[in-house]
């Protein structure tokens, strides 16, 4: 029986979670999903989850963090605001994606 290692790439607490993957060729960690329950939004809990991912990535020698937003997705404006507030800068964009990046 083979087991999934996906659990190795998630941080969570009672208010939310972040899933991520390492992009070795870019020395970056990519935040795949970041979610907090509505009652926990706006108080830094999403940043705390991202900080945990960044700390692990930095310990492993990664130097940046990447996040993406699909402009056509519901809530995309709020998602973009969250990434900007976390200190990410525009890296690139396409017809339905925005890539943000932050040095860690």
Region spans (language model):
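Conserved acetyl-CoA-binding loop-helix of GNAT-fold acetyltransferases
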Residues: 36, 42-55, 81
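GNAT/GCN5-related N-acetyltransferase fold signature
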Residues: 20-22, 36
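Conserved beta-hairpin
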Residues: 2-18
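Conserved active-site alpha-helix within GNAT-family acetyltransferase domains
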Residues: 71-92
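Conserved GNAT acetyl-CoA-binding A-motif
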Residues: 57-72
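Conserved acetyl-CoA binding element of GNAT-fold acetyltransferases
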Residues: 27-38
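STAS-like cytosolic regulatory interaction modules
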Residues: 93-104
